[in-house]
């Protein structure tokens, strides 16, 4: 069984039980929606790695194991654990000698992107990456529009800290972001945008 930071427990033997009332509805739906974007980014990253283009991986979600059962000598079963809040962002790695760090978010709302989808510690982390010369950005997918935007981190963090509103309008992404191209082998080919913005010939 998995315990969340608030001390509540959720049984994880099946997807149906995971999405129980012990877990806030918004968090469950957001996690489910994010899996498709995450899957596509992972496929893209595998292509980059296989073709020696870049080394970029998803960061593991921190978990504290509380109890382990050993039903067999050769098997161990985790029966209780805590999900920790992620401390930074989703992905990081190296591309063309530069450190790459980014967050990826799915969004089901057509007209805007809720700022609560990005946590304050993630904003601080993105700012820190920029201060130390890394390339940081946010990938936001408007699911219903089937559009995926690349947004440089500074534009997101500036909006987060200065705008007097709780969401970022869709039109803002059209002006401040770049649509990410897609192909069969690279469903979210974000390095094409990195090349265009950060490695101008």
Where are these regions (language model features)?
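Mg2+/Mn2+-dependent nuclease catalytic core
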Residues: 105-132
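Charged phosphate-binding loop/patch that engages nucleotide di/tri-phosphates or the phosphate backbone
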Residues: 2-24, 28, 174-201
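Nucleic-acid nuclease catalytic cores
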Residues: 127-157
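Conserved catalytic cores of phosphodiester-cleaving nucleases, focusing on short active-site segments
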Residues: 89-110
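Short, electropositive alpha-helical surface patch
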Residues: 151-173
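Positively charged, polar, low-complexity stretches
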Residues: 53, 68, 82-93, 162, ...
